[in-house]
Design a protein with these regions (language model features):
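Mixed-charge, low-complexity intrinsically disordered regions
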Residues: 124-224
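A short pocket-lining beta-strand/turn micro-motif at the edge of beta-sheets
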Residues: 65-67, 108-112
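Short, electropositive alpha-helical surface patch
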Residues: 9-17, 48-55, 82-99, 122-159
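Short acidic/histidine-rich active-site segments
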Residues: 111-119
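Acidic/histidine-rich catalytic cores of soluble enzymes
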Residues: 1-90
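Glycine-centered helix-coil hinge/cap
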Residues: 58, 62, 94, 178-181, ...
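Glycine/serine-rich loop-strand microenvironments at binding/catalytic pocket rims
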Residues: 28-32, 102, 108-110
């Protein structure tokens, strides 16, 4: 879903059409990946955006096919079509998106699978390295994130507890968000420049065709 373009499964409509081709649907299921969806242009960040996305999923695909969720934040910006997983609350999705998820009745009883990085970072988001300069890893990060997700069930997003969690995690993810934002902006600039160059070439071709047509008309008139 993150890739978009000509990749099958990049939209809810793709999933719907694929499922429609299967005769025996008893074992058909869809896994909803939060990072993939966000990168593919499906917003989850506010209650309104989240409800719109999930209502669209229910209407187009059918919530009966939803079997599991892969729960990841996104290092890359919204609709960037880049599948780059981030730790919960540190990416462009942000902690409120995951508050929406853990409090969504339609997800009750579904398995939520973490696919987040296990690189150790300090409070400012810098990688913690060992004596040899190698980035440290810690699988206990997953246990911490599971507890974080569980703690947000029923939590008030305007409470002091939530706001502190949100701020701390956003701070931790800022270096990676800034880095990926810059990459995304450069990519858009290159694409815009490429499009402008292509447009100029097309305009020149039209001008040449018009000039050629005018010359033909003159020659034709002279011949008469």
């Amino acid at each position: 879903m993150a890739a978009g373009g000509n990749v099958l499964g990049s939209t809810f409509e793709d999933l719907r059409d694929t499922i429609a081709l299967i005769d025996d649907k008893d074992r058909v299921g869809v896994c909803f990946d939060t990072c993939h969806a966000f990168a593919g242009g499906y917003d989850l960040r506010t209650p309104e955006a989240f409800n719109t996305t999930m209502d669209d999923f229910e209407r187009i695909v059918g919530v009966k096919y939803l079997r599991a969720l892969h729960v990841n934040d996104s290092k890359a910006p919204f609709s960037s079509h880049r599948d780059l997983h981030a730790n919960i609350g540190t990416g462009f999705l942000g902690l409120r998106a995951f508050h929406n998820i853990v409090n969504e009745p339609r997800f009750a009883g579904l398995p939520l699978v973490l696919e987040t990085p296990i690189e150790v970072r300090d409070a400012d988001g810098q990688l913690v390295k060992d004596d040899k300069g190698k980035a440290q890893e810690d699988k206990n990060i997953w246990a911490t994130e599971i507890k974080l997700l569980e703690s947000m069930v029923g939590m008030d997003v305007e409470s002091e507890e939530f706001l502190k969690l949100e701020a701390d995690l956003a701070r931790k993810g800022k270096p990676e968000r800034d880095r990926l934002w810059e990459q995304n902006e450069k990519k858009k600039e290159k694409e815009a420049a490429k499009g402008a160059k292509k447009g100029k070439g097309k305009g020149k071709k039209v001008e040449d065709e018009e000039e050629s047509s005018e010359l033909s008309d003159v020659e034709s008139a002279g011949g008469e």
